[in-house]
A protein has these predicted regions:
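Condensing-enzyme catalytic core of the thiolase-fold
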Residues: 2-475
Length: 475
């Protein structure tokens, strides 16, 4: 085995990508939706558990639209050379995530089904839903079934025990049959170990939950694996599976949902966010290794910063990211913003930009701002991953991509004095600074409990990923 000397400053190349979000089965499809300024959000069907417009248990609005994966979620095992059928009580998220990993590796010309060797690679994955088909099925067979029978005995004290046992048997028959495999694959550590095994990655495989920052946390760990020499290739990704009513109801106690049909980031009077579904994976290598292997490079990761910004300096994490990358802040030409549609969070975001860029001066640098959430909704744990896909393609194609145009843009970003401008139309990404390549920053925020009285400049937990173009003379 070749010994690698740690280099904590080396650029990390994105050499493969995959994604599946509402109406977008690939990075190319997502890019097309972005460039067309098209919302892929869909209205919940007639079988939706909670009728549109009805209030939920927290007396909050239920979203009238949601980023539905629909058929893009159905990744059958035959697509993965899996030898048997999927049990109805198994965790379908596993096969969806495995297919995303396969798609990313195929994009990087690392076809897992065509090689026998194992790569010296790690898998870092953001995923932790409160419910999945496997865990719910086991609860139904155990605690829920016992509770149901106790309720029946309480309200029908004279019912013959034999009749009650017959009811119990019928209830069991109506449920998917449980098995040890489905139970174990419903747990996080077996979930990510499965992906590593199927993709022939022999290194560390971990699953994590950092809320909306999960995609960034997965990238952070993968980058450290490569820079420390613990891996020669890394798979990093995040997933938000189809959202259940139970999850949405719980989330509504903390998050302001929009009742508008579309999410248009950075509106003057936003009504809230729209939840989305989906996931993405990235294949990462050290740049020197990617060049040696003649890989296509979408973009370079220069730094990843995650942490809590204090109330008096909400821009601290952004500053940390640029300091780690060793670059001046004003050389960043694109901010793929959080743009959640939640007023306090967007105000905090624009306040960070104002603090760092200041007022515009003639001849001074400008930074374009936009968000992919208008296209696919707020994909929660996968939100940062979606932003990285968009920003990486923007760097590859040298285009400043648009977002959905707000009816009334937020004044703090739409005013002439601002050094930031909202990207409501696509623009060629022209730079006259030969000393600095094109750079983008992807921002993400965790939700704070909804508080209409919160201060604009309040701190919070956030993530910033700095991306850079691969030099033009190499392409």
């Amino acid at each position: 085995m070749v010994q690698y000397n740690a280099n904590m400053d080396c650029p990390i190349a994105i050499v493969g990508m995959s994604c599946r979000f509402a109406g977008c089965g690939s990075p190319a499809a997502l890019w097309n939706a972005v460039m067309a300024k098209k919302s892929m959000l869909t209205v919940p069907g007639a079988d939706a558990e909670l009728p549109i417009g009805q209030r939920n248990v927290f007396n909050g609005p239920y979203p009238t639209r949601i980023g539905q994966l629909d058929k893009l979620y159905s990744c059958v095992p035959s697509m993965q050379h899996f030898p048997r059928q999927v049990n109805a009580g198994e965790n379908q998220d596993l096969y969806f995530a495995t297919q995303l990993a396969f798609d990313a590796l195929n994009d990087a010309e690392m076809h897992p089904n065509r090689v026998k060797k194992h790569w010296r690679g790690s898998v870092r994955f953001g995923y932790a839903p409160p419910f999945n088909a496997s865990t719910v099925n086991w609860l139904q067979h155990t605690a829920f079934l016992d509770q149901t029978m106790d309720i029946l005995r309480r309200f029908m004290p004279k019912a013959p025990e034999a009749k009650l046992e017959e009811v119990r048997s019928k209830l069991v028959e109506s449920l998917p049959a449980p098995n040890a495999s489905s139970f174990l694959l419903g747990s996080g550590f077996r979930f990510v170990s499965w992906i590593a095994r199927e993709c022939k990655f022999a290194g560390a495989a971990t699953i994590m939950d950092a809320g909306n920052l999960s995609g960034g946390a997965a990238i952070l760990d993968a980058v450290e694996d490569l820079r420390c020499g613990n891996a020669d290739v890394a798979l990093a990704g995040a997933l938000t599976p189809p959202l259940s009513r139970a999850y949405l109801e719980g989330l509504s106690s903390e998050v302001q949902f929009s009742t508008n049909p579309e999410l248009r980031s950075f509106e003057e009077n936003p009504s809230g966010t729209i939840p989305g579904e989906g996931g993405a994976f990235f294949v990462l290598k050290r740049r020197e290794d990617a060049l040696r292997d003649h890989d296509r490079i979408y973009a370079l990761i220069r730094s990843v910063a995650i942490g809590h910004s204090p109330d008096d300096d909400p821009s601290a994490i952004f500053t940390m990211a640029t300091e780690q990358a060793g670059i001046p802040i004003r050389t960043i030409g694109l901010i793929e913003a959080d743009g959640s549609g939640i007023a306090q969070m967007e105000a905090r975001e624009t306040d960070i930009i104002r603090r760092l860029w200041g007022e515009h001066k003639p001849g001074g640098p400008l930074v374009g701002v936009g968000s992919v959430k208008g296209n696919i909704g707020h994909t929660l744990k996968a939100a940062i991953s979606a932003g990285i896909v968009k920003a990486a393609l923007a760097l590859k194609y040298r285009v400043l991509p648009p977002q959905l145009t707000p009816d009334a843009p937020l004044k703090s970003i739409a005013c002439p004095e601002s050094s930031a401008y909202l990207l409501t139309e696509a623009r060629p990404w022209i730079t006259g600074d030969s000393a600095n390549p094109r750079r983008a920053a992807v921002m993400g925020f965790n939700f704070d409990p909804f508080n209409p009285e919160a201060e604009t400049s309040r701190g919070g937990r956030s993530a910033v990923i700095v991306l850079e173009e691969e030099p033009e003379d190499r392409l």
